[in-house]
Amino acid sequence: MADDATRKAVSEIPLLKTNSGPRDKELWVQRLREEYLAPIKYVENNKAADNDWFRLESNKEGTRWFGKCWYIHDLLKYEFDIEFDIPVTYPTTAPEVAIPELDGKTAKMYRGGKICLTDHFKPLWARNVPKFGLAHLMALGLGPWLAVEIPDLISKGLITHREQQGS
């Protein structure tokens, strides 16, 4: 998996029990309850550890998610909009997180700003269906991607901090 801090953070995220996707209307409501509770717990834990880095919300059906994530680099906060849809084959298929404003700036991204998680995250997700949910997607997918890609994009001058854009 990853370093000890990540293992600890992930071990504190509640595992999900309901194996259901959006096509199964009755069980999806139960799964959605679990999906809401796990990120809430993860964000609470992150805040307690002074490591708060994202917010998520969804449409009423829980099939479209959006929010913000941020990354601190050299004491500057870089903030990005994120979005993803729940696949109809969820939870067997992991959602694909998109950061539209970074589209085309890194090779580790697909068209539309979808971040590449195929090599490291998707096999881990597949081994943990249906226990993993959106909080795990953030902790083991988006978080590590940001930690690798954002400093690289900054060093290449492909993204700049908002305060530096005006000068």
Swiss-Prot record:
PANTHER family: UBIQUITIN-FOLD MODIFIER-CONJUGATING ENZYME 1
Residues annotated as transmembrane: none
SUPFAM superfamilies in alphabetical order: UBC-like
Keyword Nucleotide-binding: no
Coiled coil: none
InterPro entries linked: UBQ-conjugating_enzyme/RWD (IPR016135), Ufc1 (IPR014806)
Molecular function as annotated in GO: UFM1 conjugating enzyme activity
GO biological process: protein K69-linked ufmylation; protein ufmylation; response to endoplasmic reticulum stress; reticulophagy
Role, per record: E2-like enzyme which specifically catalyzes the second step in ufmylation. Accepts the ubiquitin-like modifier UFM1 from the E1 enzyme UBA5 and forms an intermediate with UFM1 via a thioester linkage. Ufmylation is involved in various processes, such as ribosome recycling, response to DNA damage, interferon response or reticulophagy (also called ER-phagy).
Name of the protein in its database record: Ubiquitin-fold modifier-conjugating enzyme 1
Keyword Chloroplast: no
Assembly: Interacts with UBA5 (via C-terminus). Interacts with UFL1. Interacts with UFM1.
Gene Ontology, cellular component aspect: cytoplasm
Gene: ufc1
Keyword set, alphabetical order: Ubl conjugation pathway
Similarity comment: family membership: Belongs to the ubiquitin-conjugating enzyme family. UFC1 subfamily.
Lineage top rank: taxon: Eukaryota
Active site location: C116 (glycyl thioester intermediate)
